[in-house]
Design a protein with these regions (language model features):
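Short, well-structured alpha-helical segments in soluble
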Residues: 89-100
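Active-site-proximal region of nucleotide-activated glycan assembly enzymes
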Residues: 124-179
């Protein structure tokens, strides 16, 4: 019997996030060793919020990083923090509900990072045998801190870390910030 695929969704919103998520996306879309290891196959969905979006630049960025084109584009565009975050919340929720991944991966500290993590953290489904489940949330670049409360990104980082189940750190300093 074939194991159920592990459904992974990677949500990106800005150019720096593509670079942070690129190694993971390439690993998940590369040759599978699921048969040899006994691990389930992976079903990947890449969602681009369009937070910082220029068609030619985004396409070039995906190509330069050897990434597949995004499966979903929310086309949010630039704008004030509240408007942009609100649009991402509104547009990402139905995508998450339809795709229903086992794991949502977010990267960095932009409004997309926080908004997508918040949607997943609030999305629960009742299990057939009882109990509840939501997608696990993994945060790439967890623990990064500027210690500048006037930076919107600092708020996004701290809140995303608090919402996440898996904190993917990049340095000993980041680990220390999470302890």
């Amino acid at each position: 019997m074939q194991p159920q695929p592990l459904k992974v969704m990677v949500a990106v919103g800005a150019r720096p996030n593509y670079m942070k998520a690129a190694p993971l996306i390439r690993a998940l879309t590369g040759p599978s060793t699921a048969v040899e290891t006994g691990r389930p196959p992976i079903e990947l969905t890449v969602t681009h919020t369009g937070q910082h979006y220029e068609d030619g630049l985004s396409r070039t960025q995906f190509e330069e990083l050897s990434l597949p084109a995004a499966d979903v584009n929310l086309n949010v565009g630039s704008g004030p923090h509240g408007r942009q975050t609100g649009l991402i919340l509104q547009r990402f929720e139905p995508v998450l509900e339809e795709q229903w991944p086992d794991v949502l991966v977010v990267a960095g500290d932009v409004n997309s990072t926080l908004a997508c993590a918040l949607v997943a953290a609030k999305s629960w489904r009742r299990l057939p045998g009882g109990g509840w489940k939501r997608p696990r949330i993994a945060h790439i670049e967890a623990g990064l801190r500027s210690f500048d409360p006037t930076m919107p990104e600092e708020t996004n980082r701290r809140l995303t870390d608090a919402l996440s189940d898996d904190l993917l750190i990049h340095s000993p300093e980041a680990r220390g910030n999470l302890l």
